[in-house]
Regions:
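Helix-rich catalytic cores of soluble enzyme domains
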Residues: 1-138, 142, 151-156, 163-171
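Context-gated lysine
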Residues: 3, 16, 104, 151-157, ...
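Long, compositionally biased intrinsically disordered regions
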Residues: 169-241
Length: 241
Protein backbone atom coordinates (compact mmCIF):
# COMPACT_ATOMS: atom_id res chain seq x y z
CA UNK A 1 0.00 0.00 0.00
CA UNK A 2 1.04 3.58 -0.59
CA UNK A 3 1.26 6.11 2.24
CA UNK A 4 -1.50 8.04 0.49
CA UNK A 5 -3.87 5.06 0.72
CA UNK A 6 -6.27 4.98 3.66
CA UNK A 7 -5.11 2.56 6.36
CA UNK A 8 -8.12 1.45 8.39
CA UNK A 9 -8.61 1.24 12.13
CA UNK A 10 -12.02 0.16 13.43
CA UNK A 11 -13.53 1.13 16.76
CA UNK A 12 -15.54 -1.51 18.61
CA UNK A 13 -19.16 -0.79 19.55
CA UNK A 14 -19.65 1.30 21.44
CA UNK A 15 -16.57 3.46 22.12
CA UNK A 16 -14.36 0.51 23.03
CA UNK A 17 -10.60 0.48 22.50
CA UNK A 18 -9.03 -2.74 21.28
CA UNK A 19 -5.40 -3.11 22.27
CA UNK A 20 -4.48 -4.94 19.09
CA UNK A 21 -5.61 -1.91 17.12
CA UNK A 22 -3.27 0.33 19.10
CA UNK A 23 -0.29 -1.41 17.51
CA UNK A 24 -1.69 -0.61 14.09
CA UNK A 25 -2.27 3.02 15.08
CA UNK A 26 1.33 3.32 16.24
CA UNK A 27 2.66 1.69 13.08
CA UNK A 28 0.54 3.83 10.76
CA UNK A 29 1.41 7.02 12.61
CA UNK A 30 5.15 6.34 12.68
CA UNK A 31 5.09 5.41 8.98
CA UNK A 32 3.29 8.65 8.10
CA UNK A 33 0.30 6.85 6.59
CA UNK A 34 -3.21 8.16 6.02
CA UNK A 35 -5.31 6.75 8.89
CA UNK A 36 -9.00 6.09 8.33
CA UNK A 37 -10.89 5.41 11.55
CA UNK A 38 -14.17 3.54 11.04
CA UNK A 39 -17.11 3.12 13.39
CA UNK A 40 -20.79 2.26 12.91
CA UNK A 41 -22.84 3.22 15.99
CA UNK A 42 -25.90 1.01 16.35
CA UNK A 43 -29.33 2.58 16.79
CA UNK A 44 -31.24 0.30 19.15
CA UNK A 45 -28.06 -1.37 20.38
CA UNK A 46 -25.80 -0.68 23.37
CA UNK A 47 -26.24 3.09 23.08
CA UNK A 48 -30.04 3.03 23.12
CA UNK A 49 -32.36 5.37 21.23
CA UNK A 50 -32.00 8.26 18.83
CA UNK A 51 -30.57 10.92 21.14
CA UNK A 52 -28.23 8.53 22.94
CA UNK A 53 -26.88 7.03 19.72
CA UNK A 54 -26.29 10.50 18.29
CA UNK A 55 -24.24 11.44 21.35
CA UNK A 56 -22.23 8.23 20.96
CA UNK A 57 -21.76 9.02 17.28
CA UNK A 58 -20.27 12.43 18.07
CA UNK A 59 -18.03 10.85 20.69
CA UNK A 60 -16.87 8.23 18.18
CA UNK A 61 -15.80 11.02 15.83
CA UNK A 62 -13.79 12.72 18.57
CA UNK A 63 -12.32 9.38 19.64
CA UNK A 64 -11.16 8.79 16.07
CA UNK A 65 -9.06 11.94 15.95
CA UNK A 66 -7.67 11.70 19.48
CA UNK A 67 -7.11 8.08 20.48
CA UNK A 68 -6.68 6.67 16.98
CA UNK A 69 -4.91 9.70 15.44
CA UNK A 70 -7.17 9.53 12.38
CA UNK A 71 -6.67 11.56 9.22
CA UNK A 72 -10.37 11.13 8.57
CA UNK A 73 -13.31 9.31 10.15
CA UNK A 74 -15.68 6.98 8.30
CA UNK A 75 -19.08 6.94 9.98
CA UNK A 76 -22.04 4.64 9.36
CA UNK A 77 -24.85 4.69 11.92
CA UNK A 78 -26.78 1.46 11.40
CA UNK A 79 -30.29 0.37 12.40
CA UNK A 80 -30.36 -2.62 14.78
CA UNK A 81 -33.50 -4.13 13.26
CA UNK A 82 -32.90 -3.53 9.57
CA UNK A 83 -29.10 -3.65 9.35
CA UNK A 84 -29.00 -0.60 7.10
CA UNK A 85 -27.79 3.00 7.16
CA UNK A 86 -30.81 4.37 5.30
CA UNK A 87 -33.54 3.99 7.94
CA UNK A 88 -35.05 7.23 9.21
CA UNK A 89 -33.39 6.88 12.62
CA UNK A 90 -29.96 6.01 11.19
CA UNK A 91 -30.12 9.06 8.92
CA UNK A 92 -31.05 11.27 11.88
CA UNK A 93 -28.10 9.98 13.91
CA UNK A 94 -25.72 10.55 10.99
CA UNK A 95 -27.08 13.97 10.09
CA UNK A 96 -27.33 15.50 13.55
CA UNK A 97 -24.06 13.94 14.67
CA UNK A 98 -22.02 15.24 11.78
CA UNK A 99 -23.71 18.63 11.90
CA UNK A 100 -22.55 18.95 15.51
CA UNK A 101 -18.98 18.08 14.51
CA UNK A 102 -19.02 20.56 11.63
CA UNK A 103 -20.30 23.36 13.87
CA UNK A 104 -17.43 22.99 16.36
CA UNK A 105 -14.65 21.34 14.34
CA UNK A 106 -15.14 22.19 10.65
CA UNK A 107 -11.59 21.16 9.69
CA UNK A 108 -12.13 17.51 10.66
CA UNK A 109 -12.66 15.29 7.61
CA UNK A 110 -15.63 12.93 7.87
CA UNK A 111 -17.32 10.39 5.63
CA UNK A 112 -20.24 8.00 5.71
CA UNK A 113 -20.74 4.49 4.34
CA UNK A 114 -23.85 3.30 2.52
CA UNK A 115 -25.81 0.11 3.25
CA UNK A 116 -29.28 0.29 1.69
CA UNK A 117 -31.67 -2.62 2.24
CA UNK A 118 -32.65 -3.11 -1.41
CA UNK A 119 -30.25 -4.34 -4.04
CA UNK A 120 -29.08 -3.24 -7.52
CA UNK A 121 -31.60 -2.88 -10.29
CA UNK A 122 -34.35 -1.58 -7.99
CA UNK A 123 -35.84 1.86 -7.58
CA UNK A 124 -35.87 1.40 -3.82
CA UNK A 125 -32.09 0.98 -3.67
CA UNK A 126 -31.59 4.23 -5.53
CA UNK A 127 -34.10 6.11 -3.36
CA UNK A 128 -32.41 4.84 -0.19
CA UNK A 129 -29.07 5.95 -1.61
CA UNK A 130 -30.49 9.37 -2.44
CA UNK A 131 -31.81 9.87 1.09
CA UNK A 132 -28.42 9.21 2.61
CA UNK A 133 -26.61 11.30 -0.02
CA UNK A 134 -28.86 14.24 0.85
CA UNK A 135 -28.28 13.76 4.58
CA UNK A 136 -24.51 13.50 4.20
CA UNK A 137 -24.13 16.47 1.88
CA UNK A 138 -26.28 18.81 3.91
CA UNK A 139 -24.71 17.85 7.23
CA UNK A 140 -21.28 18.74 5.87
CA UNK A 141 -19.52 15.48 5.11
CA UNK A 142 -16.53 15.57 2.82
CA UNK A 143 -16.59 11.91 1.76
CA UNK A 144 -19.37 9.54 0.69
CA UNK A 145 -18.45 5.84 0.61
CA UNK A 146 -20.87 3.68 -1.28
CA UNK A 147 -22.84 1.90 -2.28
CA UNK A 148 -22.92 -1.51 -0.53
CA UNK A 149 -26.32 -2.48 -1.92
CA UNK A 150 -28.45 -5.24 -0.35
CA UNK A 151 -26.96 -4.28 3.03
CA UNK A 152 -23.52 -5.34 1.81
CA UNK A 153 -24.17 -8.97 2.70
CA UNK A 154 -25.16 -10.47 -0.67
CA UNK A 155 -22.43 -11.66 -3.02
CA UNK A 156 -22.07 -9.65 -6.25
CA UNK A 157 -24.99 -7.35 -5.42
CA UNK A 158 -23.44 -3.95 -6.09
CA UNK A 159 -22.77 -1.91 -9.23
CA UNK A 160 -21.37 1.44 -10.26
CA UNK A 161 -24.73 3.00 -11.12
CA UNK A 162 -25.70 3.24 -7.46
CA UNK A 163 -22.50 5.19 -6.77
CA UNK A 164 -23.13 7.42 -9.77
CA UNK A 165 -26.63 8.21 -8.50
CA UNK A 166 -25.21 8.90 -5.05
CA UNK A 167 -22.77 11.45 -6.45
CA UNK A 168 -25.36 13.12 -8.65
CA UNK A 169 -27.73 13.62 -5.73
CA UNK A 170 -24.91 15.04 -3.60
CA UNK A 171 -24.18 17.66 -6.25
CA UNK A 172 -27.87 18.38 -6.79
CA UNK A 173 -28.61 19.30 -3.16
CA UNK A 174 -25.38 21.08 -2.24
CA UNK A 175 -26.25 24.53 -0.90
CA UNK A 176 -30.00 23.96 -0.55
CA UNK A 177 -31.66 25.44 2.59
CA UNK A 178 -31.97 22.99 5.48
CA UNK A 179 -35.70 23.54 5.95
CA UNK A 180 -36.27 22.52 2.34
CA UNK A 181 -33.92 19.56 2.73
CA UNK A 182 -35.84 18.30 5.75
CA UNK A 183 -39.12 18.42 3.83
CA UNK A 184 -37.58 16.52 0.92
CA UNK A 185 -36.06 13.90 3.21
CA UNK A 186 -39.28 13.35 5.10
CA UNK A 187 -41.17 12.70 1.88
CA UNK A 188 -38.38 10.61 0.34
CA UNK A 189 -37.87 8.26 3.30
CA UNK A 190 -41.63 7.73 3.50
CA UNK A 191 -41.51 6.27 -0.01
CA UNK A 192 -39.42 3.26 1.00
CA UNK A 193 -39.32 2.76 4.78
CA UNK A 194 -42.47 0.64 4.79
CA UNK A 195 -40.87 -1.87 2.42
CA UNK A 196 -37.82 -2.93 4.44
CA UNK A 197 -39.34 -6.30 5.36
CA UNK A 198 -40.05 -7.27 1.75
CA UNK A 199 -37.24 -5.40 -0.03
CA UNK A 200 -35.92 -6.91 -3.25
CA UNK A 201 -32.25 -7.89 -2.85
CA UNK A 202 -31.79 -7.02 -6.50
CA UNK A 203 -29.71 -8.47 -9.29
CA UNK A 204 -26.06 -9.34 -9.78
CA UNK A 205 -23.57 -7.10 -11.52
CA UNK A 206 -23.71 -9.24 -14.67
CA UNK A 207 -27.51 -8.90 -14.74
CA UNK A 208 -27.35 -5.11 -14.36
CA UNK A 209 -24.42 -4.34 -16.67
CA UNK A 210 -23.08 -5.20 -20.08
CA UNK A 211 -19.88 -6.77 -18.78
CA UNK A 212 -18.02 -6.30 -22.06
CA UNK A 213 -18.75 -2.59 -22.42
CA UNK A 214 -19.02 -1.99 -18.64
CA UNK A 215 -22.20 0.07 -18.99
CA UNK A 216 -25.64 -0.38 -17.39
CA UNK A 217 -28.22 -2.40 -19.28
CA UNK A 218 -31.20 -0.64 -20.83
CA UNK A 219 -33.38 -2.29 -18.19
CA UNK A 220 -31.33 -0.82 -15.34
CA UNK A 221 -31.28 2.59 -17.00
CA UNK A 222 -35.08 2.50 -17.08
CA UNK A 223 -35.04 1.88 -13.31
CA UNK A 224 -32.57 4.76 -12.94
CA UNK A 225 -34.89 7.02 -14.95
CA UNK A 226 -37.78 6.13 -12.65
CA UNK A 227 -35.72 7.11 -9.62
CA UNK A 228 -34.66 10.35 -11.32
CA UNK A 229 -38.32 11.20 -12.01
CA UNK A 230 -39.20 10.68 -8.35
CA UNK A 231 -36.33 12.91 -7.23
CA UNK A 232 -37.41 15.64 -9.65
CA UNK A 233 -40.94 15.51 -8.27
CA UNK A 234 -39.47 16.05 -4.80
CA UNK A 235 -37.52 19.11 -5.96
CA UNK A 236 -34.10 17.55 -6.52
CA UNK A 237 -32.63 17.91 -10.00
CA UNK A 238 -29.07 17.25 -11.19
CA UNK A 239 -27.79 19.16 -14.22
CA UNK A 240 -27.70 16.11 -16.55
CA UNK A 241 -31.11 14.69 -15.62
Amino acid sequence: MRKSDSHEISQLNELKAEMGAMAFVAHYALAGNIIMDECMPIFGGFAGGLEETTIVNVAAHLNAFTLNMATWHLDGPVHMRWGCTTAREALAVAGHGNRAIEEKHPTLMTGNQYYPVAGPGTVMCLLETAAQAITDTCSGREIVSGVASAKGVKVDKTTGLEARFMGEVCHAVAGMPLDQINEILDALVAKYEGDFMTADEGKTYAECYDTNKVVPTDEYLEVYDQAVAIMKDLGVCYKTW
